[in-house]
Amino acid sequence: MKESTEEGKAFENASAEYVKDTSNHVRSNEWEKMAAMTRGENYVEPEKPKAFERIDKVNYYLGIAKAVSERGTCLRRKFGAVIVKNDRIVSTGYVGAPRGRKNCSDLGYCFRMEHNIPSGCMYEKCRSVHAEMNAIISADKEELEGAVLYLVGVENDGSITKKADCCAMCKRMIINAGIRIVVVKTPDSYKAINVDDWVVNDDSLELHEGY
């Protein structure tokens, strides 16, 4: 017992500059650990420093597009768009009626919903201008050429729209605007679309996709 006590004191003396007289120590090296153990104290491994986390640029702009969507007035779902060129935001857009006209949120009803019109069909019956369109008309032509458009759709329950896509009308405007890439948020990640693919696949402009 005497030898054990002397050994314990030796460990304490060797690590005296680190060890504090408390009942539960957090140590940073083996000397501290052994000294605590010889005194019958609990040793708690120090937490490893967490790696610095920084959101990537794509999700950064998608996050902004999601925030923009909160201004939307559509009763079905909200969409937000952000156009970026040379790492600079050119313009933003959300779903809403033309200036001076009442929004669906003001009227309290959506004609397309009341008549069970599916997404991607009969947009002439919709009061609103789409997010992509509003973003495009808010930017100068020079700023649109070669730009990237970020798009996020949000359902009424707050979840990300599962199969979000630009409608045929918005695709035509995006092509003519000279936008190079469209990035669409998905529930788990995002998808990047080369706008040239819409030009090559001409039938894509006739599909019933969109809001």
Locations of regions flagged by a protein language model:
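Short intrinsically disordered terminal tails
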Residues: 1-4, 24, 210-211
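Short secondary-structure boundary/capping segments within folded domains
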Residues: 71-74, 82-84, 140
